[in-house]
Structures are given as C-alpha cells and as structure tokens.
From Swiss-Prot:
PANTHER family: NAD KINASE
SUPFAM superfamilies assigned: NAD kinase/diacylglycerol kinase-like (SSF111331)
GO biological process, one term: NAD metabolic process
Broad enzyme group: transferase
Species whose genome carries this gene: Mycobacterium leprae (strain TN)
Annotated GO MF terms: ATP binding; metal ion binding; NAD binding; NAD+ kinase activity
Name of the protein in its database record: NAD kinase
Purpose: Involved in the regulation of the intracellular balance of NAD and NADP, and is a key enzyme in the biosynthesis of NADP. Catalyzes specifically the phosphorylation on 2'-hydroxyl of the adenosine moiety of NAD to yield NADP.
Catalytic function, reaction form: NAD(+) + ATP = ADP + NADP(+) + H(+)
Gene3D superfamilies noted in UniProt: Probable inorganic polyphosphate/atp-NAD kinase, domain 1 (3.40.50.10330), Probable inorganic polyphosphate/atp-NAD kinase, domain 2 (2.60.200.30)
Pfam families per the UniProt record, alphabetical: NAD_kinase, NAD_kinase_C
Keywords: ATP-binding, Cytoplasm, Kinase, NAD, NADP, Nucleotide-binding, Transferase
Length: 311
C-alpha cells in the first residue's frame, strides 16, 4: 500500500473494545474531530475486534473523516500530536507506552470502574474533544522508572514503568528471601511475597493495595513497599527520586518475576538483582481539570467527608 500524505493534525485513538460504551464513544470522537479537520489513527486489532466499531470506521470514512488504520508497533504514535484513550487504567497504561515512545501527551477518558489515571468520564467526551481541538489542555510530566535485571553483574533484561515494578514470587512457590538496598547501602533482609517499587502516580494502584501511602503526583519520589513481609521492619519507605533502589534474591532460593505496570514480564533468577532508578524519559500527561489531587482522591475512592466545614 502506498503511504498517504500525513495530515496536518493526527490523534492516535486507543480503545478498550471490550466495553459496550466504547463503540458509541469512539463514534462520537470520530465525528467531532473529523468535522474539525483532525485525522484519526486507529490500531488495526481494535478496528476489527468489534464489528460495530469496524462498521463505525467505515461509516466515518464515507462521511469524509480521515481515518488511518495501522498495525500495532512501538512507534505507532509517531507523527501524532496526542494519544486519546477510551477505557480504564489498563488501557491507559497500554496507551502511555505508545505516547512515551513518541514523546507526546496522553489523555484518558474513563470507561472503566475507577479510572484513576483518566482525566474525564465518558459522559464528558464532548468537553474533552473541545479541549483537544483547541489544544487547550496543559501538559504535566510524570516520573517513570528504569528497571534493570542483573545476574553476576551482567544485565540480562530491562524495562520501564509508569506505575510500578512489582517483584513477585512464582506461582505456588515459597517465600522470597530478599535484601533491600537503597543508595548503595543495605536496609533490611526479610522473607516476603514480593516488593513493589512505585512512582507517585502508581501509589494509588498496586502499592496502595499492598499497604503503601498515597503520594501526590507532583511529588518527586520513589516508593518501596514490601508485600507481606515476614519482618519487624517491613514498612513502606519513601526515597529520593534520585536514589537507586536494588533488591537482591538469595542465591539458594527461588527465581522470581518482575511485572512492569502489570504488563511487561521479566524473570529474575535466584541470586539475581533488580535495580530501579528514575528514568530520563517521563510520560507526558494531558490535563484538563484544575481541581486539586485531593478532590480526585476523594471522588475515585469515594472517601467519606461528611461533617467537613472548611474555612
């Protein structure tokens, strides 16, 4: 196929096609942005995953909307100005990987349950699109993590994470014996089910479920949360964003797994070492809401605030 000339403005649309409301919301996106001369890029797997979404694409093309269907590729967002996400937090994390590679902002519209990473709910899609068309969103940079697995001093695998790196024992295996090291110094040795190393963005995700504190996203820090540690000092720790956090597995123990944002998996052999540092490439986050993070925390977790009188 002969590549067509790139449109002046292009938005990559990433959709959770398993949700019933995704097709109608995507159709609304295509109609509004198409009417304003913005081209859409859609992943081929999503275009054919649901028949109704595929039909919507054909209908929009017939109406003159510029739609490009492309195969999944790490560089698929190159040439786009924004990645627009319709889905939950899992879909957002998938889209953030594409946006980070292209170094463009990612904007989430929640179709899931909590949608902590999303900027708006599905019913506000028209308002979201007004901001996209006018480019009236602001862009924040969110800290990400570089993740390296070593064995005998050699790098055997590496990755990155926006939310967290989760060190976990394998299925049906015993407790992991680990040594936690921060800034090149040992902190504690203990047995555990795993250890999470999280960003402030990820502090409301798996790290929160494991007993970690909530960190405001504009705080620059790295959070270390032992998971079911058999130790007197098995408490979460908040470190400098410039610290190197390392976790060593005991040499005569079991292999372990590392999950980056619950998506990308690596294996750490017994005696191996996990190193986590701040990554030089952040995720660019498109923001519409000027309300403080406190409001989002209360809303998403449905925290009781009855009786508050304020100033």
């Amino acid at each position: 196929m002969t590549p067509r000339k790139a449109a002046q403005r292009t938005v990559l649309l990433v959709v959770h096609t398993g949700r019933d409301e995704a097709t109608e919301t995507a159709r609304r996106v295509k109609k509004i942005v198409g009417d304003n001369g913005i081209a859409l890029r859609v992943l081929s797997a999503e275009a054919v995953d649901r028949g109704s979404l595929h039909l919507a694409l054909d209908n929009m093309r017939a109406m003159g909307v510029d739609i490009e269907v492309v195969d999944a590729d790490p560089h698929v967002a190159q040439g786009c100005e924004l990645v627009l996400v319709l889905g939950g937090d899992g879909t957002f994390l998938r889209a953030a990987e594409l946006a980070r590679t292209a170094r463009i902002p990612v904007l989430g519209v929640n179709l899931g349950r909590i949608g902590f990473l999303a900027e708006a709910e599905a019913e506000a899609i028209d308002v979201v699109l007004e901001h996209v068309i006018a480019r009236s969103y602001r862009v924040e940079e969110r800290l990400t993590l570089d993740i390296v697995v070593r064995q005998g001093g050699n790098i055997i695998d590496q990755g990155w994470a926006l939310n967290e790196a989760s060190l976990e024992k394998g299925p049906r295996l015993g407790v992991l014996g680990v040594v936690v090291e921060i800034e090149g110094r040992p902190v504690s040795t203990f047995g555990c089910d795993g250890v999470l190393v999280s960003t402030p963005t990820g502090s409301t995700a798996y790290a929160f479920s494991a007993g970690g504190p909530v960190l405001w996203p504009d705080l620059e820090a790295i959070l270390v949360v032992p998971n079911n540690a058999h130790a007197l000092f098995g408490r979460p720790m908040v470190t400098s964003p410039d610290a190197t956090v390392a976790i060593e597995l005991e040499a005569n123990g079991n292999d372990a797994l590392v999950f980056c944002d619950g998506r990308r998996e690596m294996i750490i052999p017994a005696g191996g070492r996990l190193e986590v540092t701040r990554c030089a490439t952040p995720v660019k986050w498109a923001r519409l809401d000027s309300a403080p993070f406190t409001d989002r925390l209360v809303s998403k977790f449905r925290l009781p605030v009855t009786g508050w009188r304020g100033k």
